[in-house]
């Protein structure tokens, strides 16, 4: 188990020791959660550390952490922006037509549209040396793929968060995907 997962498990056990038998949650569920956390730590710990270092370097150098996503995944953008006690230099890149509240069918169509990422990110104030976090459940739609390429071409450090398990089983919809 990685260091972060071990600390989480220790804190959990400390809190659990204060509970009565009636209050204890189902062990099977919690065991699965900790197994998943340990697996994520083992498989992605180095990548998560590299992403954190990149964001720190951007902010420490006077830059920003840009955060972008489409569909349901846009919620990570909202979670990272303007939170009490959170990071201040976060630039949320939110486009109404790529979010569900204006219509799920329209949003789905728009996130598959070539050129849409450049249109949205072109107005976002991206600068070389900054870091951008792009979140996508599957990683297969055109806009997130084009957004990563657009940012990389402009000298940003690109951090992508997706489900590898899902994205490996689906064909990309992005014409330029490699």
Give the residues covered by each predicted segment.
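Short, Lys/Arg-enriched N-terminal segments with co-localized hydrophobic residues
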Residues: 3-18
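Generic N-terminal amphipathic, Lys/Arg-enriched alpha-helix
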Residues: 19-42
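Short, contiguous, pocket-lining structural segments
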Residues: 25, 47-50, 72
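Short amphipathic alpha-helical segments enriched in leucine
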Residues: 34, 38-41, 56, 60, ...
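Short, surface-exposed connector motifs at secondary-structure boundaries
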Residues: 36, 58-64, 128-132
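A short, well-structured juxtamembrane/interface segment
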Residues: 43-60, 120
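Glycine-rich phosphate-binding loops that contact phosphosugars or nucleotide phosphates
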Residues: 54, 67-178
């Amino acid at each position: 188990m990685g260091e972060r997962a071990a600390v989480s498990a220790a804190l959990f056990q400390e809190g659990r020791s204060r509970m009565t038998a009636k209050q204890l949650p189902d062990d099977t569920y919690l065991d699965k959660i900790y197994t998943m956390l340990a697996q994520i730590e083992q498989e992605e710990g180095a990548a998560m550390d590299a992403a954190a270092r990149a964001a720190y370097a951007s902010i420490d150098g006077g830059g920003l952490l840009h955060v972008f996503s489409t569909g349901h995944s846009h919620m990570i953008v909202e979670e990272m922006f303007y939170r009490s006690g959170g990071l201040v230099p976060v630039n949320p890149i939110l486009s109404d037509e790529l979010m569900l509240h204006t219509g799920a069918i329209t949003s789905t169509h728009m996130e598959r549209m070539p050129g849409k990422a450049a249109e949205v990110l072109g107005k976002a104030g991206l600068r070389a040396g900054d870091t951008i976090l792009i979140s996508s459940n599957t990683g297969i739609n055109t806009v997130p793929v084009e957004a990563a390429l657009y940012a990389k071409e402009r000298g940003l450090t690109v951090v992508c968060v997706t489900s590898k398990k899902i994205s490996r089983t689906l064909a990309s919809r992005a014409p330029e995907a490699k």
